[in-house]
A protein has these predicted regions:
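Membrane-proximal basic amphipathic "stem/tether" segments
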Residues: 1-33, 74
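Active-site and donor-binding regions of nucleotide-sugar-utilizing enzymes
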Residues: 27-167
Length: 167
């Protein structure tokens, strides 16, 4: 079922790619933390301080689907159409975790996709090093191919991040 949702997302994203990338548009994607009390929150605060950025948030609240029919329709519309458009037209995309629809989409060459990850350092296995089930590992590999940058806490951990994200 998830694969169907990812495929629908990708089709809508491709349509949204017909719109130009908007200079200064930044999409902050936080699929598991809607409060921005992590590295994405720091990026958001800095972008707001600098000004001149059109910040678009994509959080787990956009992804959650309700049992209430009206909320379900609104949530599905927001997830499939609004978040696809925001990603497709963003000049910069910052993520702090895996966002599996990335496995099915291709960004404009103008878009920079930055994985911040939600936990600095390498105290645990993460990304491709966490030995996920084969079907999840394949999705993660496809997601990682979309990253143009990954941020880590030190030069000393670059090899671990490179391995974890397949960079």
């Amino acid at each position: 079922m998830k694969k169907l949702f990812y495929t629908i997302y990708a089709v809508i994203f491709r349509i949204c790619r017909l719109f130009p990338v908007k200079r200064g548009r930044v999409a902050l994607v936080s699929p598991h933390n809607a409060d921005f009390n992590d590295s994405l929150g720091a990026v958001k605060a800095e972008l707001e301080r600098r000004g001149d950025y059109d910040i678009k948030l994509i959080t787990r609240r956009d992804i959650e689907l309700s049992k209430n029919p009206a909320k379900l329709i609104k949530g599905a519309f927001r997830f499939f159409f609004v978040s696809s458009y925001r990603l497709a037209t963003a000049q910069y995309v910052f993520l702090n975790d895996n966002f599996m629809p990335l496995a099915y989409i291709n960004f404009s060459p103008e878009t920079k996709v930055v994985q911040l990850w939600h936990a600095e350092g390498v105290f645990k296995r993460f990304g491709l090093c966490s030995a996920p089930p084969p079907e999840i590992e394949e999705l993660e590999k496809r997601c990682c191919k979309r990253y143009t940058h990954a941020v880590c806490s030190s030069k000393n951990v670059v090899p671990y991040y490179a391995k974890a994200f397949g960079l």
